[in-house]
Structures are given as structure tokens and as C-alpha cells.
Amino acid sequence: MGNRNYLIEGVSCTGKTTVCNELQRRGFHAIHGDRELAYQGDPETGTRTDTATHQNHIWHVDKVKALIANSDEEVTFFCGGSRNFSKFIDLFDAVFVLDVDIDTLNRRLIERPEKEFGGKISERELIVRLHHTKEDIPRDGILIDATAPIQHVVDAIFQETEEK
């Protein structure tokens, strides 16, 4: 939906939703991908699945492509995580990966409500493993230190977009 489109990724509890909220507060067009684009499906085929698992948390590729093709907005930020990002990552002008140290991650996980992903112990263990392995986030993204206050995190993203 923008002339310039940016993806903001990262493991759970790195601040993707908070960054999206701050971008919207500042008046930017920012899409909560996990709320607006996500569903449970096969990451390769897109076929819907009946089970709710982390591995099947994917985005509607056609919706992502349509939003990127629409140039009504000068800049659009897509915030969230998906297991099928490889199907559309090349459409973005830049990809940012939010990262935090393990102590910050553990603190945020403890604070997470049980009803949200990461609120259960088994989910926390998965998130900590994914934090260590980086296996389901873009490898070539621009790392953003998301341990800082949210205003500084968003400022760091803006600084990187100006350099592109």
C-alpha cells in the first residue's frame, strides 16, 4: 500500500506489535500483519490447516502483494511474523529484524498474558529456542536493537530507511 514498503520481523516478544502501534501513533501507515493478514496454513502451499501451531502461522500472500501494489500511501510498514515470508520478502524495499538479548526476552515472556502466544511455558521454550537458532526469521534483514525504549527503536528504523 505504499510507494515504499518495509517488513518488520522478529521472534515473539521482540516488539513488533509495539513498533506497529508507535508507527501508527506517529501517523504512518502500518499494518499489524499478525492481526490483519495471518491465518493457519501450510507455509509452502497456503492451504488452510485445522491446527493452530506456530509453524502454520502464515500471511495471505495475495493480500500482501495487493497491499504492496497499491500506491495510495507513501510508506507502508508491515509488522509481524509469518512462516511464509519467503513467498513475498523480495517485494519489500527493506526488511528489519527486531532483536533483544535473552534477559530482555525472558522478562517480556514472563510478562506476557497466558492467552497470548508465548504465555504458556511450552510456547516460551519454543520462543527461546527460536531466539537462539534464528531459524524462522529473515536472515538478511537489518538488525534493530529492540531493547531500547520504543521511541528509539522506531527512530533507528527511520534512520535505516533514510539510508536506503
Q: Where are the predicted features?
A:
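The Walker A (P-loop) glycine that initiates the GxxxxGKT/S ATP-binding motif of P-loop NTPases
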Residues: G10
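Conserved glycine(s) of the Walker
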Residues: G15
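Conserved Walker
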Residues: T18
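Loop/turn-to-beta-strand initiation segments
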Residues: D72-F77
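Small-molecule kinase domains that catalyze NTP-dependent phosphoryl transfer to phosphate-bearing small molecules
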Residues: F85, E114-Q159, E163-K164
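Conserved phosphate-donor/acceptor-positioning beta-strand/loop module used by diverse small-molecule
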Residues: L91-E111
